[in-house]
From Swiss-Prot:
EC primary class: ligase
Pathway assignment: Cell wall biogenesis; peptidoglycan biosynthesis
Binding note for cofactor: Binds 2 magnesium or manganese ions per subunit.
Name of the gene this protein is made from: ddl
Taxon lineage: Bacteria, Bacillati, Bacillota, Bacilli, Lactobacillales
Protein name per UniProt: D-alanine--D-alanine ligase
Length: 349
């Protein structure tokens, strides 16, 4: 039986490029090489596409994906050179220029099936402010109170709005970033100004969100029209909040899978996750993140259309708990990618 070609894109231009490399390494090792030939391409911070390695069998423990320190400059290609008939692309890219619709649009122009959600829903879900506004207008899913700040708005009046509508502590987030990059906790106005300045380094749109004392719960989502969800998992923190260092550097978190939650609340979360996924027009996969307060209130935090895929990431572990191994999960994602590609092509009549 001939093998299917899977193209891995990793790296990227965003501040989340290091997370992308970690995720791609894990995907590379989890693939069933009886079924796939894997071709890898590294995207540099400057946006150049570099042809890196090919794998037709299980990589050894010493095999590492090439990155900035090991890429060969002469292997630079035109982005369109990744095209290969019948190949499927797995864009293991996080953050802007990776999961915001940019690479998805490029792949649709190339007429290549790709893992993950489409242009519009990638773009909407990537922006936390837009996600909140869409879900507010179209669903009854609870969200924590927030204030949106757009660069150029009068800062003092926006600070006053925050202090009128919210209570310290608040969390300040770049609207268009993930992996906790650029997020700060503000206990007072001085903190708030500093947090806004930091967030504006990453995006011109900033979400200022009411801090809540809550458990952090996540639900995995898989499917196109037939949407499946996992039992929830919980992030058990040993730090003040689940920041970038805690997630990917210090490993100061543990996970409880499945989370110990009242079954009624579990079903509510799974229903909210599927509803948000459909409302935003998603397909393929996502991870829906929630806050769960001590008195049982559930708030949707965000929908992540390309969740982390490292060996300690919640998304693949959630599906493993449901009986779907990492390698079979990848095969299912490839199948869903081809299904959506065929559907998009059929609509061009």
């Amino acid at each position: 039986m001939s093998k299917e070609t899977l193209v891995l894109l990793y790296g990227g231009r965003s501040a989340e490029r290091d997370v992308s490399v970690l995720s791609a390494e894990s995907v590379m090792r989890a693939i069933n090489y009886d079924n796939f030939l894997v071709k890898t391409y590294f995207i540099t911070q400057a946006g150049d596409f570099i042809k890196t390695q090919e794998f037709d069998s299980q990589p050894s423990e010493t095999d590492k994906l090439m990155t900035n320190d090991t890429i060969i400059a002469s292997q630079k290609i035109k982005p369109s050179d990744i095209y290969e008939e019948e190949a499927v692309v797995f864009p293991v890219l996080h953050g802007p220029m990776g999961e915001d619709g940019s690479i998805q649009g490029f792949l649709e122009v190339l007429k290549m099936p790709y893992v993950g959600t489409n242009i519009l829903s990638s773009s909407v879900a990537m922006d936390k402010i837009t996600t909140n506004q869409v879900l507010e207008s179209a669903t009854t899913i609870p969200q924590v109170a927030y204030v949106a700040l757009i660069e150029g708005e009068p800062l003092e009046s926006k600070l006053a709005e925050v202090e009128e509508k919210l209570i310290y502590p608040v969390f300040v987030k770049p609207a268009n970033m993930g992996s906790s990059v650029g997020i700060s906790k503000a206990e007072n106005r001085t903190d708030l100004k500093q947090a806004i300045a930091l967030a504006l380094k990453y995006d011109s749109r900033v979400l200022i969100e009411q801090g809540v004392d809550a458990r952090e719960i996540e639900v995995g989502i898989l499917g196109n029209t037939d949407v499946k969800t996992t039992l929830p998992g919980e992030i058990v923190k040993d730090v003040a909040f689940y920041d970038y260092e805690a997630k990917y550097i210090d490993n100061k978190i543990t996970m409880a899978i499945p989370a110990e939650i009242d079954p009624v609340i579990v079903e509510k979360m799974r229903d909210y996750a599927a509803t948000a996924f459909r409302t935003l027009g998603c397909c393929g996969l996502s991870r829906c993140d929630f806050f769960l307060t001590e008195d049982g209130k559930v708030y949707l935090n965000e929908l992540n259309t390309m969740p982390g895929f490292t060996q300690w990431s919640m998304y693949p572990l959630l599906w493993e708990n449901m009986g779907l191994s990492y390698s079979v999960l990848i095969e299912e994602l490839v199948s869903l990618a081809k299904e959506m590609f065929d559907k998009r092509e059929s609509h061009l009549v």
